[in-house]
Amino acid sequence: MNINDIFLKRKKRWGIINRLRDSEEQADGSLTPSRRIALISDDKSFRELYAQVKTGNPNSFPGYEQKVEANRLKTGQQDAVVTGTCRIGGVKTAVAVMDKRFLMGSMGIAVGEKITRLTEYAMKRKLPLIIFAASGGARMQEGLFSLMQMAKTTAAIEKFKDAGGLFISYLTNPTTGGVSASFASLGDIIIAEPGALICFAGPRVIEQTIGQKLPEGFQHSEFLLEHGMIDMIVDRKDMKQTLSKILKMHVNTGGEA
């Protein structure tokens, strides 16, 4: 058996495993993009966009290509976000779902490009936009190119909102680093899952820096709701119903979908 046969065999095996995993929650309680999309979208309404967008290795970081390929095999995704359109309660919506299984959902060139393209697509077609964030932050291996995605996605979202678009940011566990400091914090409505860690730097880093113990639950969704940083906490079983209500209110008050 040559190396190509081994590679294809591994790819097929991972594909079977991923299809089985996609029907359930992960061991840590997180949802795969396909499972989350299935929970929120009307039956067979999802259409993926920009699946062909891939990252490179702009800094020639040793071993990066191999790590990316391993994560592609493991997840069945090209990168750490799935983008497309679906109907939620009958309302056509642009949706992005981040995948923390893929290099901890880190944002690099491909993630920034896909989110930016989807935002521009939603603006052109006057669709509401929902992004489910799940990320460890900017992708270290892509360096400055990764950090540039913070400004790029932020600019796209602000342009979308200035044009009258509705942006719902849905924060899941964890939403941290450069993602929390960019588009994830810009929602017209910001929703979080119960118990989600939402921060820039983690609590351990902050405690080591300031030399003080942080309050109980600091940087979790309940703490942020209590202090006015997010608008609501919604359990997964209520995801579709809540989003459907918000989207229908938007349509009924003059928004387009």
From Swiss-Prot:
Gene3D superfamilies to which the protein is assigned, alphabetical: 2-enoyl-CoA Hydratase, Chain A, domain 1 (3.90.226.10)
Domain CoA carboxyltransferase N-terminal: start-end pairs: 1-257
Top EC class, one word: transferase
EC number(s) given by UniProt: 2.1.3.15
Catalytic activity as recorded in UniProt: N(6)-carboxybiotinyl-L-lysyl-[protein] + acetyl-CoA = N(6)-biotinyl-L-lysyl-[protein] + malonyl-CoA
Keyword set includes Cytoplasm: yes
Record GO terms (molecular function): acetyl-CoA carboxylase activity; ATP binding; carboxyl- or carbamoyltransferase activity
UniProt keyword annotation of Nucleotide-binding present: yes
Keywords associated with the record: ATP-binding, Cytoplasm, Fatty acid biosynthesis, Fatty acid metabolism, Lipid biosynthesis, Lipid metabolism, Nucleotide-binding, Transferase
UniProt-annotated location(s): Cytoplasm
Record pathway: Lipid metabolism; malonyl-CoA biosynthesis; malonyl-CoA from acetyl-CoA: step 1/1
Domain of life where this protein originates: Bacteria
GO cellular component assignments: acetyl-CoA carboxylase complex
Gene Ontology BP term (one): fatty acid biosynthetic process
InterPro entries membership: AcCoA_carboxyl_beta, Acetyl_CoA_COase_Trfase_b_su, ClpP/crotonase-like_dom_sf, COA_CT_N
Family: Belongs to the AccD/PCCB family.
Physiological role: Component of the acetyl coenzyme A carboxylase (ACC) complex. Biotin carboxylase (BC) catalyzes the carboxylation of biotin on its carrier protein (BCCP) and then the CO(2) group is transferred by the transcarboxylase to acetyl-CoA to form malonyl-CoA.
Subunit and partners: Acetyl-CoA carboxylase is a heterohexamer composed of biotin carboxyl carrier protein (AccB), biotin carboxylase (AccC) and two subunits each of ACCase subunit alpha (AccA) and ACCase subunit beta (AccD).
Name of the featured protein: Acetyl-coenzyme A carboxylase carboxyl transferase subunit beta 1
Organism of this sequence: Lachnospira eligens (strain ATCC 27750 / DSM 3376 / VPI C15-48 / C15-B4)
Species lineage: Bacteria, Bacillati, Bacillota, Clostridia, Lachnospirales
